[in-house]
């Protein structure tokens, strides 16, 4: 697309169109642009080809004449294009105290991730509708988020009442309240399970228990097979040793490589005598 360099002359061209009858009505912007006309052309072009215009062009510094020659700078280098003052245009990183508390809690209690959680939320601010003056809530299960919100409430309450409480003290208090309620939950579930078993309730095994049971069945069967094979191997080993078929010589031969050959002197002499006798018989024949 061709660069439009006549944008500043739009008022002049429109007035000519009105006089010539091409345009019958004035545009809505005609009087405004006539009162405040554009002062300069912002099109960036080399100063070598336009030496009289663009006196107030902001990009004029990019096209300064080099020292020791008649050349002009027509394009910016890496230093001109690099972004300065990065902290001004950089999007600030959002940091919240709640995220730091969640990170600390779940690093100290990694098994809390294994508990089932409800990921469906209506508005996303259900925790703000709870009364965090106490840890246990009616419509929210006890989890790590309860510790986080309880810690924030303790900090805000300490400012209102004038009591000095640090973040570490508030987190410790909320954490110990969480431990106490968690122990109460586990104790009540254990007692209710024992009471139900006493009245005849039968609890099916979990998927983990069922898998361990099946694995143990295969392990028991293989233990019997492995024991029988071990007895057979030991019996064969004892039998070979008793018959003398596995002596010191056999062990040495088994350790030797197949590429190594050991010759006996008597075998060599006998073989040479046989070859000589065969040769003599052939000559006589």
Swiss-Prot record:
Major site of localization recorded for this protein: mitochondrion
Keyword terms: Mitochondrion, Ribonucleoprotein, Ribosomal protein
InterPro entries listed in its UniProt record: Ribosomal_mS23_fun
UniProt keyword Ribosomal protein present: yes
Subcellular location, record wording: Mitochondrion
Family: Belongs to the mitochondrion-specific ribosomal protein mS23 family.
Name of the protein in question: Small ribosomal subunit protein mS23
Organism: Debaryomyces hansenii (strain ATCC 36239 / CBS 767 / BCRC 21394 / JCM 1990 / NBRC 0083 / IGC 2968) (Yeast)
Lineage: Eukaryota, Fungi, Dikarya, Ascomycota, Saccharomycotina
Gene: RSM25
